[in-house]
Amino acid sequence: MTRQKILITGASSGLGAGMARVFAAKGRDLALCARRTDRLDELKSELGQRYPNVTVAVSALDVNDHEQVPKVFAELSDALGGVDRVVVNAGIGKGAPLGSGKLLANKTTIETNLVAALVQIETALEMFKTSGSGHLVLISSVLGARGVPGVKAAYAASKAGVRSLGESLRAEYRSGPIKVSVIEPGYIESEMTAKSNSTMLMVDNATGVKALVDAIEREPGRAAVPWWPWAPLVQVMRVLPPRLTKWFA
């Protein structure tokens, strides 16, 4: 099934903007939202020039402003005449070692990556129930497969939470009419990973985003991307002794 009208959160940069470019090249209409409206406007202009037959609607949205999420989703849906896929992508990579006295960074990460994701999920489900169908895509991470020490502890926990919500929804809607996919990116070049000390198995943005979109289009229940090496590595991560998980942090 071709999902023609796609809403992406956190679309002003990184994986969100990359997905928007790839979907636009496929001729899909886009509803894009993020905090940085200047970047969104630039992206809309870029896509409009390259793909004049594609409709691109943009709106400012801070996903931590929970009351705004349903309002912005509704406005963007109206602009496109409906939405049949929502990609819950907005997130941050802040963090500090647990017990380091830097609670705010970890709290903000959990709130943005998990609590705000829950708000987006609830909003998308209401939209899909009204329309009768839809594809909900949750962007988790390979780090959601296993807790890790250091600065990524809260990030990994938040993405594990997203993964768990997705698994619950897949069971809830196992017979439809809503499809749910949990996508677990490995290390893909972006503004977020540029701030990371780990470059292990990093792939360039274009390669990573293509793998991401290809996986979304297949509408799997769950997928690590790029498949190689991350799909087998995720299985390894789940059984590693705790002392060895530092290599993924």
For each of these PLM feature ranges, what is it?
Residues P97-I110:
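Substrate-binding pocket helix/loop in short-chain dehydrogenase/reductase
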Residues K26-L43:
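Conserved glycine-rich Rossmann-like NAD(P)H-binding loop of the short-chain dehydrogenase/reductase
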